[in-house]
Swiss-Prot record:
This is Cytochrome c oxidase subunit 3. Its main location: mitochondrion. Gene3D superfamilies: 1.10.287.70, Cytochrome c oxidase, subunit III, four-helix bundle. The lineage of its organism: Eukaryota, Metazoa, Chordata, Craniata, Vertebrata. Component of the cytochrome c oxidase, the last enzyme in the mitochondrial electron transport chain which drives oxidative phosphorylation. The respiratory chain contains 3 multisubunit complexes succinate dehydrogenase (complex II, CII), ubiquinol-cytochrome c oxidoreductase (cytochrome b-c1 complex, complex III, CIII) and cytochrome c oxidase (complex IV, CIV), that cooperate to transfer electrons derived from NADH and succinate to molecular oxygen, creating an electrochemical gradient over the inner membrane that drives transmembrane transport and the ATP synthase.
Length: 261
């Protein structure tokens, strides 16, 4: 900030957008190779380069914000707008899945037996594992709010405790979801019901894994004293994202598990 007369962050040239794009190409190509030729080499390479890119990009952002002071209030305002727009785009992303589900379930075709769930499909009981999953995510929403309030009050110990609980609940949710998939009496290839169920809940599960990773990074940063009560936008973004994941799950539970069964 020494040689500039404005509060904006002029980012230095970075290779990470390019390596991120290339890793995305490798992952999508790798998925096709896995599906059609049962080879995971390209997918593994894509995932590895993606993880390395994320690590190094996050490292640079942490350096610029925490140690170099480039994230001024003006920059933080822009980042807030960016995160809001990102969450709006995610809402529209999931809207497509809900649209596909309701389009198929509200007027089932004769090929489905004229009913929903389609003939031959035995849906999961919404009062068993799905209800437990709902309780787990709602509890994690409470604990991350506790973490946020503790951070605002400067209570580092409680913030770390609450954040650890949130991460543990997120990982528990992922474990429950994996066991549910393993025991489900239908698969993704079982017509429109199987495809809408697994794609919608699967992408939500992916978002839970991403959110848990985001929170783990925040936990490690808080251990190293990176956040203060006035400067903690990285954690704030993670909390927003986690609440979004909570709300999407409530819609999934009511629509697909409860009403759809």
């Amino acid at each position: 900030m020494t040689h500039q007369t404005h509060s904006y962050h002029m980012v230095n040239p970075s290779p990470w957008p390019l390596t991120g794009a290339l890793s995305a190409l490798l992952m999508t190509s790798g998925l096709i190779m896995w599906f059609h030729f049962n080879s995971m080499i390209l997918l593994t390479l894509g995932l590895s380069t993606n993880i390395l890119t994320m690590y190094q990009w996050w490292r640079d952002i942490i350096r610029e914000s925490t140690f170099q002071g480039h994230h001024t209030p003006t920059v933080q305002k822009g980042l807030r707008y960016g995160m809001i727009l990102f969450i709006v785009s995610e809402v529209l992303f999931f809207t497509g899945f809900f649209w596909a589900f309701y389009h198929s379930s509200l007027a089932p075709t004769p090929e489905l037996g004229g009913c929903w769930p389609p003939t031959g499909i035995h849906p999961l009981n919404p009062l068993e594992v799905p209800l437990l999953n709902t309780s787990v995510l709602l509890a994690s929403g409470v604990s991350i709010t506790w973490a946020h309030h503790s951070l605002m009050e400067g209570n580092r110990k409680h913030m770390l405790q609450a954040l650890f609980i949130t991460i543990a609940l997120g990982l528990y949710f992922t474990l429950l979801q994996a066991s549910e998939y393993y025991e489900a009496p239908f698969t993704i290839s079982d017509g429109i019901y199987g495809s809408t169920f697994f794609v919608a809940t699967g992408f939500h599960g992916l978002h839970v894994i991403i959110g848990s990773t985001f929170l783990i990074v925040c936990f490690l940063r808080q251990v190293k004293f990176h956040f203060t009560s006035n400067h903690h936008f990285g954690f704030e973004r993670a909390a927003w994202y986690w609440h979004f994941v909570d709300v999407v799950w409530l819609f999934l539970y009511v629509s697909i598990y409860w009403w759809g069964s």
